[in-house]
Regions:
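Solvent-exposed amphipathic alpha-helical surface segments
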Residues: 17, 46, 50, 213-216, ...
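A short, charged, Gly/Pro-tolerant segment at domain boundaries
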Residues: 215, 219-243
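Catalytic subdomain that performs nucleotidyl-dependent activation
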Residues: 56, 136-215
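ATP-dependent adenylation/nucleotidyltransferase module used to activate substrates
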Residues: 1-139, 147, 177-185
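Electropositive phosphate-/nucleotide-binding environments in soluble metabolic enzymes
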Residues: 4, 37, 67, 110, ...
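Residue-level detector of flexible, active-site-proximal loop/helix-junction positions
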Residues: 65, 91-93, 158, 174, ...
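Short, solvent-exposed polar/charged micro-motifs at secondary-structure junctions
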Residues: 95-98, 202-204, 233-236
Length: 243
């Protein structure tokens, strides 16, 4: 996927759900993976011509694992002239050594988001951008149906009352295959996750299930995504731009 196509998908999502307003200070949550680095590129590119002016910075929560080398990400942020903050934590140690969690993902995500949002507020940002793409939204819906018995997926835009922060997901119209293509084309400095359960989670199961359904029923993933968009899910804002 070329940058221009990425910017088109990103702007469409932002306009559809009014994700960005004049004067916003937006922090991009950077895990070091392909998705978050693609989002950084997209918002940096959009910032140059989007009619509503906004500031942009990047932030990573370091879980404390050995070998988590962010030098490539640091260099990229310097090249893009985007301020970059790394939050050092012991979350990995707390999860696996202190608490010895057998199913760590939920607690880890909660602690990571807490650390991220706290620093985002300290940096003076009013919005935080997460790099969830179309596949993530569909997979979350599958997980919610299988394990919670409800039709749900996370919203394009969510206001966190307690933190007085708005979460936005500008990559919601971008497919993971396109993110992979963008990563390869632009040689993004992806940092491999050092987490010991990476690739062995319920989300990975959902990813394989969706891929299988899409192979057996071509277009199934797109149809599931449309069902989510049209599903009147609680907490989802209405689209500002009607098609």
């Amino acid at each position: 996927m070329k940058l221009q196509q990425l910017l088109s998908y990103t702007r469409r999502a932002i306009d559809d759900y009014q994700m960005i307003e004049e004067g916003d200070n937006i922090a991009v949550g950077i895990s070091g993976g392909k998705d978050s680095l693609t989002l950084l590129y997209a918002l940096h590119g959009l910032k140059r011509f989007y009619p509503k002016k906004f500031d942009l910075q990047a932030i990573t929560v370091d879980l404390g694992y050995e070998g988590f080398d962010l030098s490539g990400v640091t260099k990229l942020c310097e090249e893009l002239e985007v301020p970059y903050t790394v939050v050092k934590t012991d979350i990995g140690k707390i999860i696996f050594q202190d608490r010895k969690e057998s199913s760590p993902c939920s607690l880890c995500a909660k602690m990571r988001k807490g650390a991220l949002n706290e620093r985002v507020k300290e940096l003076g940002c009013n919005k935080v951008a997460y790099a969830h793409h179309m596949d993530d939204i569909v997979e979350t819906m599958i997980l919610s149906m299988l394990f919670e018995g409800r039709f749900y997926s996370f919203s394009p835009k969510t206001y966190l009352d307690r933190m007085e922060l708005t979460v936005i997901r500008p990559l919601m119209y971008v497919k993971e295959a396109d993110v992979i293509g963008f990563k390869n084309k632009y040689n993004l400095p992806v940092v491999k996750s050092p987490c010991k359960v990476d690739g062995y989670t319920k989300r990975q199961y959902a990813k394989k299930l969706v891929a299988q359904l899409n192979r057996e029923h071509p277009g199934a993933k797109d149809r599931m995504f449309r069902a989510i968009l049209n599903g009147n899910i609680k907490g989802w804002p209405e689209k500002a731009i009607k098609m």
